[in-house]
Amino acid sequence: MKIDVIISADYIDSESLKGKIAVVIDMLRATSVITTALYNGAKKVIPVVSVEEAFEKANELKSLGEEVLLGGERKALKIDGFDFSNSPLEYKREIVEGKNVIMSTTNGTRALNLCNKADKVIVASVLNGQAVAKYLENEEKEIVFVNSGTNGEFSSDDFMCAGYIISEICKNKEAELTDIAKTAKYVCESSEGIEEFIKDAKHYNILKNLGLEEDLKYCSTKNLIDLVFEFKNGEIKTVESGVKVTI
């Protein structure tokens, strides 16, 4: 098994992902939202790039009699006309269960759609990090951790999340790590904790200044969720792998 890391969505080369498994991370907050919404019973999550596409998809599904919720952000704030912002704490079971969630965010949904040439696209966060690691131990193809980043820039929060999952994989599986994957693993293993490490991150402080401390605490919590989610044919659903994941 070989493991690599891409540092932001701007560095994604869709063609180079052919034959590989992409693991997309937007820890603060898109993949944490996706993980939470599906864990709480959402039928599926549909990540789209533009706001216009989100409304078009919502109208299409509603015309078929489907229940739809719109979630996402621009500049970390709720989009006009959407049901939810990009706060995972809003996606409660009593609200999302059995419904389709259409999401559009600045970084995460863009990164997901840029990975469409990969053989498989897995959605990861700190919340389900160990479950993702256990799932990936059964794969032999090259794994590329795709950090969504912040507006095309490197984000230490996504890097830390990738390092955490890589570290978990390496506990049980021998892997060949690229230099950047080794660095992510080392940074994670050398830190005092995920939230402690990312407190100086630019995006962390943008969210903190907006009063979203509870989101930050939640998104930094390891292994609340023991499920794995795959982006396939434009939709994210729970993986039906037959692999038993024990947390």
From Swiss-Prot:
Gene Ontology terms for molecular function: 2-phosphosulfolactate phosphatase activity; magnesium ion binding; sulfopyruvate decarboxylase activity
First-tier enzyme category under EC: hydrolase
Chemical reaction(s) catalysed: (2R)-O-phospho-3-sulfolactate + H2O = (2R)-3-sulfolactate + phosphate
Entry keywords, A to Z: Hydrolase, Magnesium
A Pfam family that the UniProt record links to this protein: 2-ph_phosp
Cofactor needs: Mg(2+)
Listed Gene3D superfamilies: ComB-like
Domain of life: Bacteria
Coiled coil found in the keyword field: no
Enzyme nomenclature, EC number: 3.1.3.71
InterPro entries, sorted: ComB-like, ComB-like_sf
Protein family according to the UniProt entry: Belongs to the ComB family.
Record-linked HAMAP family: ComB (MF_00490)
Protein name: Probable 2-phosphosulfolactate phosphatase
